[in-house]
């Protein structure tokens, strides 16, 4: 048990402490968030000033090796291509993700890229996550398209999503940008126009609706 001697020893130890404990260092004020720095987009600048632009489509590889692809992109850049456009699993066959390939090309070559983004394979959450990643990597253009349907023979194993159509996808992408929103500046959305559509008047009307959105 505690005896008077213990209490006296405790009192002596307390008396030996300094009268005031040192104050904790003052917290430094948090740095203000830096405004988003926009990348210089040579492709959009040429497009908006009416200059001729050269866009070349180069499908992503079917395997995990990007060596030959990057070399091909480098040669196209040297030949004068302003933009590399990358299909999103064309004819619904799996290839390396177009957005990830676009990020790699943009990061390593400094080349403008236009990854295609289909409605076929992603729901809203997956679409938003991918767009945020593209923005963080400096990719500021996407092509919003419906996407080729899954071949009938594969539909038991591979499922369509189609939470959006291409017009709603374009509208959703635009809605993510602005003050207080997820993206400080917008991603430019491009659309497709099928010149060989069976009913071109309908196709043209749909294109006009995309522009309105």
Segments from the language model and where they lie:
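A generic, well-ordered mixed alpha/beta core segment in the N-terminal half of proteins
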Residues: 117-119, 125-150
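Short, acidic/polar
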Residues: 63-76, 98, 124-131, 199-209
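Glycine-rich, proline-tolerant flexible connector loops at the mouths of alpha/beta enzymes
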Residues: 2-7, 77, 81-101, 149-161
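Acidic (Asp/Glu)-rich catalytic clusters
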Residues: 44-49, 73-80, 99-110, 131-139, ...
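N-terminal amphipathic alpha-helix/helix-capping segment at the start of soluble metabolic enzymes
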Residues: 12-67, 71, 106, 174-185
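Short, small-residue-enriched loops and turns at beta-alpha junctions
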Residues: 3-5, 60-64, 90-95, 120-123, ...
């Amino acid at each position: 048990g505690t005896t008077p001697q213990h209490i006296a020893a405790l009192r002596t130890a307390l008396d030996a402490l300094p009268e005031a404990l040192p104050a904790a260092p003052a917290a430094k004020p948090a740095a203000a968030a830096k405004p988003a720095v926009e990348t210089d987009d040579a492709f959009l600048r040429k497009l908006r000033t009416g200059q001729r632009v050269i866009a070349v489509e180069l499908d992503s590889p079917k395997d995990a090796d990007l060596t030959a692809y990057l070399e091909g992109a480098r040669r196209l850049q040297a030949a004068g291509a302003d933009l590399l456009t990358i299909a999103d699993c064309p004819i619904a066959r799996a290839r390396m993700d177009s957005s990830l390939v676009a990020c790699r090309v943009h990061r390593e070559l400094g080349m403008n890229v236009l990854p295609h983004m289909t409605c076929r394979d992603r729901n809203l959450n997956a679409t938003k996550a991918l767009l945020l990643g593209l923005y963080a990597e400096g990719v500021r253009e996407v092509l919003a398209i419906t996407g080729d349907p899954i071949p009938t023979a594969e539909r038991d194993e591979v499922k369509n999503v189609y939470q959006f159509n291409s017009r709603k996808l374009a509208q959703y992408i635009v809605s993510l940008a602005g003050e207080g929103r997820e993206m400080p500046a917008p991603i430019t959305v491009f659309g497709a126009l099928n010149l060989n559509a069976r009913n071109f008047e309908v196709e043209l009307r749909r294109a006009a609706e995309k522009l309105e959105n």
